[in-house]
Amino acid sequence: MEIRRAENRDIPRIHELLTQVNNVHANGRPDLFKKGNRKYTDEQLMSIIADREKSPIFVGVDDNDMVLGYCFGIVEQFVNDNNRTDVKTLYIDDLCVDEKCRRQHIAKRLYEHVLNFARNNGFYNVTLNVWECNPGARAFYDKCGMKPLKTYLETIL
């Protein structure tokens, strides 16, 4: 598997994977997610892909250049903030591997690629949010050595 930057030609396949992720969340939290939808429109994806400095997206592709998985990154930095230091963070907005390709270490390779990208580009850390309705994702990130940074809680009224 090769890992490269996402391109506009990958959008149809990325959409399929975005729908898979959304459906996991919709099954776990139908009060918050609409089944069958996805996080981004074509226009939004084109804009994200074009902004290589602020939103790096990496795709893992097979020998036929078929996208097997992706990892969306967002560069975050609090410059001249009153109480936060100016560290540069790479936030993983989304990481997905096609459900038909799981258990082949694709997610691990994408995650490690993102860690290396962050190290090589002067980032302080890599962060992400994981939904409690997705215990498989939580277990994966725990296995990768990620540690809780903060806890986001809710009370449903």
Where are the language model's segments positioned?
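A short beta-loop-alpha structural element at the N-terminal edge
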Residues: 2-16
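Conserved GNAT-fold acetyl-CoA-binding loop/helix
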Residues: 23-46
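Conserved acetyl-CoA-binding loop-helix of GNAT-fold acetyltransferases
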Residues: 94-97, 103-116, 143
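A short helix-loop-beta-strand connector motif used in the catalytic cores of GNAT acetyltransferases and
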Residues: 43-59
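Conserved GNAT acetyl-CoA-binding A-motif
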Residues: 118-129
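Conserved beta-strand-loop-alpha-helix junction that forms the acyl-donor binding cleft
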Residues: 127-137, 154-157
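Conserved beta-strand in the GNAT
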Residues: 59, 66-75, 91, 96
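Conserved active-site alpha-helix within GNAT-family acetyltransferase domains
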Residues: 108, 120, 132-150
